[in-house]
Amino acid sequence: MELNQSEKMLFALLRSALNTIPVNSALFADVSLLSWQNCYKLAVEQGVMALAWDGIQTLPTCLQPPKALKLNWAMAVENYEKRYRRYCHTIAELSAFYKTHGITTVQLKGVGLSTYYPIPSHREGGDIDIFTYSADHSRKSDAEANRLADQIGRASCRERV
């Protein structure tokens, strides 16, 4: 299967971002607005929009997307970064909360894996996955953690009303 222009562009941007190397500039000479828009759309659909942005930053300015698209892309990346900080804050709070109840948490996937990326806040995550356990094997830490999470959820809902 032959990749189209936008797909080739996206893979080149991702390769650059993940390997911290410059993008092959030749691929970006004379790129149409439509190709840039399709590249952006594909990056969003695949959850790699911020990583693609990192690749764009290695291109000479004259080969980067048109200004309007570039501004939208930059604002979307900023939103990724804000969400990432919110996730990190929530994970820290949740881990501290469970610790006060004798439950240890281990973060799985998502934000936890982001530390392996050149810019951790540019790895998209949709939720927070944790594994819970207790040093006291007589306790059912998963059931206790679920009960506590339900309690937090109900309290949070009451605060919003």
Question: Which residue stretches match the model-derived regions?
Answer:
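Helical scaffold of the NTase/Pol beta-like nucleotidyltransferase catalytic core
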Residues: E2-K8, N19-K109
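Non-catalytic regulatory/linker segments of enzymes
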Residues: E2-L3, K82, D142-N146, S156-R158
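Conserved short internal alpha-helix adjacent to the catalytic or cofactor-binding core
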Residues: L13-L14, R158
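Short amphipathic alpha-helical surface micro-motifs
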Residues: L34, G112-S114, G153
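Conserved catalytic core of two-metal-ion nucleotidyltransferases
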Residues: R83, I91-E93, A149-R160
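Active-site nucleotide-donor binding segment shared across nucleotidyl transfer reactions
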Residues: T90-A149
